[in-house]
Structures are given as structure tokens and as C-alpha cells.
């Protein structure tokens, strides 16, 4: 296939190479697109899209350090573009999730809190907001900040209960709450939370588990399909009010 020899052409070449699993070729094409967009000027959104996609690419290549650098550069460029609040929120969420998995907890917390700030200004999918609170809960739990962790998991439940097909995710939150209440000696609340988790797991068709870490959002992130990366909300599951469990 013939591609134009400009930034958009190399961007398309990178997308096609990535779709075919030719990751090294995709990396080179994204980098060439970035150089050409920089030369064109006034193409910060396009540059941001390249760095954003490179972040996803590096995750697939198991190069998390480079993924962090790419997402951070994308975030810098999104900040210069008007109307990019959704993209900023999504990138903060990805970075927070990735840094949490890398055990860089302070940086993870900063990005997750920044994502929450963006959600106040830019409408976003409940599932993304829930995942942000889940990861904050994990940060707080690992930092022995139990009361903040309880609050974060409860906030995650608020958002998950606004979305369809989130029984498994709600179960994870209740499992975490059960664990936290148990550690604090609140056995009644702990038992109620574990029971809620078991009911939700059955509803989701999953067997009860002792402990399951929250899913790693950064690893599940889908690459944007066009030159302007959509806030991951565009690909998220549809929303709709569902009945949730009562909280202990």
C-alpha cells in the first residue's frame, strides 16, 4: 500500500503496521510522523495522538518505562489543545494505573487525582471514573491509609452502579471493603461486604475468589483508531442504571 509522505501518511502506516502485529515498524512510523508534524507546526493534537498510540504500543511490547514517557508527552500536548479535557482525563487515568502497577504510588496518586479533577469539567463514562477510584483505593490501601481506601472503593461502587454489566467489578470493590473492614476488626461490616461480593460474583457467572487484584486498565487500553485519540470512554460499555448491592 502506498502512503503519503507526510505526517498523516506515516500515522496511517503506523496504524496499519500495528494492526498487522509489526510493532517495530509501527514504532518507527509513529516517530517519523511526530517529526513531520513538528515541522508542519500547529499540529499538537496530531503529535499527541502519535505519543498516545506509542504509549499503547510500548505496553504491548512490555516496555512500561517508555510507555510512561510516551503518555506523559501526549498529556503535555493535550494540555495545549482546547477541548481536550476528555483526552487529558483518560491519559491521567492510564498513567495512574500504569504507575500503580510499577509501584510508583505517589506519582500514581497524583495522576489519578488529576483525572478526577478533569472529570469535573469533562463528562466521562462512569466506568472510567469508577476505575479511577478503584486505583486510588489500591494506592491508599497499600499506603496503610485505610479510611481513604474505604471511601475510594465506595465511590467506585457509586459509579459502577450507574453502568451496565459491572457485577464483577462491583464484587472486587466489595471484596476490598471486606478485607479492609476485617483488618480494622469490623467483622459485621466485613461479613456483609464479602457476602455482597459473593452474590455479585454469582450474578456475573464467576466462582468466588479469595482475593483478585483490580484489572489493569493500562494493559487493557485500546489504541485509538484514528489520528485524534478518543477518550477511552467512547469504547467503554454503554451506560444504564442497574440495581447495586447495599454497602456495609
Question: Locations of the language-model features?
Answer:
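TPR/TPR-like (Sel1-like) alpha-helical repeat modules
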Residues: 151-154, 158, 187-205
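Conserved alpha-helical positions within TPR/SEL1-like repeat arrays
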Residues: 8-21, 45-60, 86-101, 127-142, ...
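Short coil/turn linkers that connect adjacent helices within long alpha-helical scaffolds
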Residues: 1, 39-42, 80-84, 121-125, ...
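Alpha-helical segment of the N-proximal tetratricopeptide repeat
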Residues: 3-35
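Amphipathic alpha-helical segments of tetratricopeptide repeats
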Residues: 34-36, 75-80, 114-121, 157-162, ...
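Short, charge-rich amphipathic alpha-helical segments embedded
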Residues: 35-49
